[in-house]
């Protein structure tokens, strides 16, 4: 399951339990919309509640990251499970992404908000 919310710094995404291809499609749609609205939107990806992911989702995720490697600003990832963290780091090695990893949401949000003046705000192009 996935929840996606627009924030002043970009998108805040929380993954719950299993991250499926259907969840990724929702994320992809939100990310593409954010790219249209703001140059280099920031992303907070909270994986602390994620327990597993499907292989088809992982393949689509890699494809998307390769296609849009230079379309995003900062990416903050919240994760506490060592295996999920290793998997995320491996995926980022394949895609040239350089996210920063955090243990808590507050610190991650603060880091993303520091970059807001450089990346714009979601919905500011109205």
Task: Describe every region a protein language model picked out.
Residues 1-126:
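Amphipathic, Lys/Arg-enriched alpha-helical "gate/interface" segment within cytosolic domains
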């Amino acid at each position: 399951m996935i929840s996606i919310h627009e924030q002043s710094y970009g998108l805040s995404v929380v993954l719950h339990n299993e991250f499926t291809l259907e969840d990724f499609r929702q994320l992809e749609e939100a990310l593409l919309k954010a790219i249209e609205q703001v140059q280099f939107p920031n992303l907070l990806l909270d994986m602390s509640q994620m327990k597993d992911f499907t292989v088809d989702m992982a393949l689509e995720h890699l494809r998307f990251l390769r296609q849009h490697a230079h379309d995003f600003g900062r990416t903050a990832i919240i994760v506490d499970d060592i295996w999920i963290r290793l998997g995320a780091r491996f995926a980022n090695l394949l895609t040239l992404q350089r996210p920063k990893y955090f243990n808590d949401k507050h610190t991650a949000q603060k880091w993303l908000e520091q970059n807001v003046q450089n990346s714009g705000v979601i919905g500011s192009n109205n």
